[in-house]
Amino acid sequence: MTNVFVDSRRDLRERAFQALFSLEFGGDNLTAARFAYTYDKNEEEEAELPLFLLTLIQGVSDCRREIDKNISIHLKSGWTLSRLTLIDKSLLRLGLYEIKYHKETPERVALNEIIEIAKKYSDEKSSKFINGVLSQFVLERK
């Protein structure tokens, strides 16, 4: 039986963030996605992974160089991508990917979802920072 909340888009974004964070330490996309999706579920190892989850993880991986370039452009003078925490970097990558490349999700929805996940996994200062960087990117696209 599938729990609607557990497979909500927000939950899948959160699991994509967890997978992207773990990939900073090595591994492959599918293994990271499978672990992030099933680690707290009573599901078999062979549970079908939601397409949305796989799309986010693979999309960030495929576009990572361009995403990192866009993030770097929007950082304040003196800041570099390497100076960011892995949590903030992973959230920015996921948010920017969904805003720029995943056309099914309205920009403002993607922005709000990443900010809510940031509030859960980071501190208030970081969630405001992520909001500022991604909001600036959204405003420049208009």
Curated annotation (Swiss-Prot):
UniProt KW Transcription keyword: yes
Record keywords: RNA-binding, Transcription, Transcription antitermination, Transcription regulation
Pfam family, one: NusB
Secretion signal, residue range per the UniProt entry: none
Keyword Transcription: yes
Family the entry assigns: Belongs to the NusB family.
Protein's recorded name: Transcription antitermination protein NusB
